[in-house]
């Protein structure tokens, strides 16, 4: 093998001294200056190449750019190429056969300069030494017996070392060569629709046998794998040549918690992910197909791989933060970027197979970074890693935080603009989006003001109910949006209709009138205002709606929750094994409801004359679904989308997936966990000092707090009665309670643990009704004398109160 040359790392700025290939000296100062200018010019050229020439998907490129002179004044030509592990842009002498990256210390072999036939010859030569499975298994058995004898008879360290020597040599040979690894664990039939071409049963067996023998053998396995990955020797002529990465990824030591193994296994994993992430696009597609086959098509197996890489990202974030003490420390970390790209491959496979929930890809440690700084870097297209490039890694809470921060920034900008406009024009310019409505004319007043083109809907929302004394600090706008959307999105209003009698979902009305287009535009603005102001709506829309909102392509499966009976019928048509033409008697037309009766529509030109048969039934189904979900509602959705983007236009909304945008708009669908809500609730009492004095002195932090947590008030009768009463309420009454206290009947999209309720006991027994401050999720009650009295007062408050007043 050629000895590697130490190479300057152009992208990171790290440099190792490269000895002059030809001696040179400068005869004059002008010659030195000219050479210096030349070096600066080339350096700028390299930086431009680095910034503009990289693949935006971070896929490996084998670009081969020659430079006339290096930056050391030598006339030797240099070549620029990315490292196969960390993707740093490197330069090396054109005649070199290998070079070492100064960042990740990986030796890169320059095989891409060989022809295809030369590469195949070299690959077959390197893998010519065949190791049979039987020989490997027999060596393991012999070593196990030899180790037992050595430990029983002598216990001598040298004897134990000698007993394991044959197996250690075999491990070094097998796990030090990609071709041998691929040959050893390949199945006879190779890749197929069901199999990735590897014998995973054999892989598990050999790993188990090797790692349960002796620590010296385990260490040799780790050493051989790390040595291989420090010089991968890639041949790049067939994606299947990289299957050895899947074999190495099955090493159980990667999940080890032993202190002696963790550092080595982490080093191995980062190199596996590094090489895998920097392969070319064709090979990435090959790995995605492997991730859809056995054993990856087992949800538990797939989940373990996702958890392994997520754990690696989390640990890396903690390690680098502890060294840098900066919240944007990870942006140039190649290990995190490599792990994220590998996760993208797994995510792509999961999107097609739906093996595990998409929330399984969330990296919880990413919630603790400076999310808005990450978002700004992504928006500015700075050439560095950002989590926003891989939004499936960000949790729902992280995305909501980014959206809220972005909305707050826009609101502040609008308020500042209003302030300066007031000064310059000497006129009062409203810094808020003010909506003033009469409760008995809610729909009429609201739509009139939303239709006002002079209003800026990106300002912070403030609502005033005329004739009421409520001051909007959050609660009034929540109730206004809740009441208004229930009317606008109800089937009685006419803009949206029920998809099917058996479905609760709403869809755009096919038989719209031209004058209703403006109403669709206003309903889009209304939904945008809700998201912009972090308010949940009571709107039942199918998955297809949210995918269209994010401009994602629709598929046949999106019809499932939209029109389930139609979906089942079309699926039966696709799976029917008999004669479709004579059995179904269909043609390329469909019947749709109109204002008066039904109307027949051709799915393609001449569709009424074209029968559906076994050959074209798939085309019929796709055209049917496309017409139903896209063509029939094109004008309605276009108006709705324009209104929505008028408020929510921007990059933050694109971070969400369709299931997440549904939660963002509607709130959490989960059943309310009142036990969890009780545990995060805080309290304050009219006799709080008495309670505080009863708390042990060993817990001074709680006595100093303004509010008390549940554990310190749980024995008070009024608290026991209250939670017992709430837990026994019907679902309808529980929703009324949420509306009474918060102004909305839903908990936040991130769940009950992020929803804090505050309960104040205002005084001793009283005949007054409970009071709520919806702006602050605050309930005020009195210490009623009995459970029955508490129930009577609370029921009255929930069922009979309406409107906002100041007491």
Curated annotation (Swiss-Prot):
Gene Ontology terms, MF aspect? ubiquitin protein ligase activity; zinc ion binding
> What EC designation does it have?
2.3.2.26
Report the subcellular localization.
Cytoplasm, Cytoskeleton, Microtubule organizing center, Spindle pole body
Catalytic activity field: S-ubiquitinyl-[E2 ubiquitin-conjugating enzyme]-L-cysteine + [acceptor protein]-L-lysine = [E2 ubiquitin-conjugating enzyme]-L-cysteine + N(6)-ubiquitinyl-[acceptor protein]-L-lysine
Domain HECT: start-end pairs: 453-807
Keywords in alphabetical order, please.
Cytoplasm, Cytoskeleton, Meiosis, Transferase, Ubl conjugation pathway
Involved pathway(s): Protein modification; protein ubiquitination
Pfam families in UniProt:
HECT
Q: Which residues form the active site?
A: 775 (glycyl thioester intermediate)
GO cellular component, as recorded: cell division site; cell tip; cytoplasm; mitotic spindle pole body; nucleus
Q: Which GO terms describe its biological process?
A: meiotic cell cycle; protein polyubiquitination
Q: Which PANTHER family match?
A: HECT-TYPE E3 UBIQUITIN TRANSFERASE, UBIQUITIN-PROTEIN LIGASE E3C
- What is the recorded function of this protein according to its Swiss-Prot or TrEMBL entry? Probable E3 ubiquitin-protein ligase. Has a role in meiosis.
Q: What is this protein called?
A: Probable E3 ubiquitin-protein ligase mug30
